[in-house]
């Protein structure tokens, strides 16, 4: 008996591992609601706490990379909604959950319902792109399902009036918040389908909390939108608000104003497009007419060019050109011959000796004249220099000094007598006067004082 069961015997490690795998594979990720107790946060940054209700509790861990996304600080005794994976801590065999996200219990329950309905409808194919209806372009009538007193309706009408004032708008007023709102929204959708007045529907409201927007997360509303034959544009809340209606609708707009922009044409832009098209059409017509006109003119000219009179005129013109060319050629030949004759005559005249003799005689006459002028200039210059020298010599000549009453005496040996010591009594000296010489004997010598 024992031997037949040995193949089913688990070790403790294998048992814990098997149980962990079963928990993780079979349970997967779940939402758990409970009260926090024994909350701790060691230096690692992970959270460890116990989640309990009136009759049971379970150990929980939330690692740092997950708890950093939690927007509040968990408190002891706080009711929370936790999205977690079920697992087993193998070394101790402790069953525990690993939390991935955490929300306060009130809003968290709504989020849980939202996720569950989203998964359900997605599995049924309500979000598939193949079911989306294209929006009409352009829309001829717009239906609006929203509160008749809300800001969303005001924004939608304001945009439609600005962009396309002539576009008809039908309002299906409903509550957009509260217990009665989902039913009213469904009836408004069904009424719009039954009446068939509009070719596109805007369903939406202004922003708010998850609870405020909950009517658009209602399954009845989602299925009514899906079954609707009229294309639907959802416009719920702000751009960050995403509802089930957004997934089911044929197109999601981030805001009610944006939805109005999507379903309407901008008449000013349309007018600009028409004007631009008119301009392009006018330019195309002008180009076409100009092109045809050019083509007609070309054909007309070609026909004219084939006319016999025109061909005869062209031949006459060609003949006249030939006559002119022959005349020009003859004139050119005569001119060339004349020029050659002139060049020959010029060369012959250059070889005649008579012009060369005339040029040589003229050259000799020029040289004689220049030589005579040079001699005259040199003689005049020499006379002037000689006169200057005579004047200078006369100014320094001893004769000029004698003429003024002075005399010059010399000794018998011809030396000029300058001092008395050169002579003595009884010496003969010669004295030069202006008009002659005289000899005299020195009687006595008296030194000057």
Curated annotation (Swiss-Prot):
CDD domains listed in its UniProt record: ExoVII_LU_OBF
Stored InterPro entries: Exonuc_VII_L, Exonuc_VII_lsu_C, OB-fold_nuc-bd_dom
GO terms for MF: exodeoxyribonuclease VII activity; nucleic acid binding
Main location: cytoplasm
Reaction(s) catalysed by this chain's protein: Exonucleolytic cleavage in either 5'- to 3'- or 3'- to 5'-direction to yield nucleoside 5'-phosphates
A Gene Ontology BP annotation from the UniProt entry: DNA catabolic process
UniProt-listed Pfam families: Exonuc_VII_L, tRNA_anti_2
Annotated compartments: Cytoplasm
Enzyme Commission number: 3.1.11.6
Superkingdom as given in the UniProt entry: Bacteria
Cellular component aspect of the GO annotation: cytoplasm; exodeoxyribonuclease VII complex
Keyword annotations of the record: Cytoplasm, Exonuclease, Hydrolase, Nuclease
EC top class named in words: hydrolase
Residue spans crossing the bilayer: none
UniProt similarity note: Belongs to the XseA family.
Function, in words: Bidirectionally degrades single-stranded DNA into large acid-insoluble oligonucleotides, which are then degraded further into small acid-soluble oligonucleotides.
Subunit details: Heterooligomer composed of large and small subunits.
Protein name, UniProt field: Exodeoxyribonuclease 7 large subunit
